[in-house]
Amino acid sequence: MNEEPSKTYVVFRSALFSFAWPKEGPDLAPPWGKDCAAFVKERLRAFDEVTSINGPHQDESAWTLDVILGGERYELHVHWALIDEPPVDCWVIQVYPVMGLIGWLFRRPLQHFSKLLKNVSQILETTEGISDVQWMNFEEFSNVY
């Protein structure tokens, strides 16, 4: 079976979130997007299926939200990126399932993964001030990032 890779990267434009440079330290540290991640967190709380959401906490290049949906764990990595040529300021959300060793060994289907992607899509599509929402798979994202 030749299945299309999942589109788990969403790129969008918005002036709702800050592009302010850090006052101290090296350029771009901490990464931009904490306010965007906090916004997504608050909007995800409105969905009944989301039983837990923690963060945002800072990783090396993104702000991460830890989400539990229907007993399944996911991470949302939220960050700023220059996309396309010529480069355009964009926001990116990368959605990843978090599985333990047993989950990877037995590859049980994730029943709630598509629901989480739909919830994120609904948040972005219905928020005034967010535009140019594009879902991509890893290869598509790598080609524009």
Name each model feature, range by range.
Residues 38-74:
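Short, intrinsically disordered low-complexity segments
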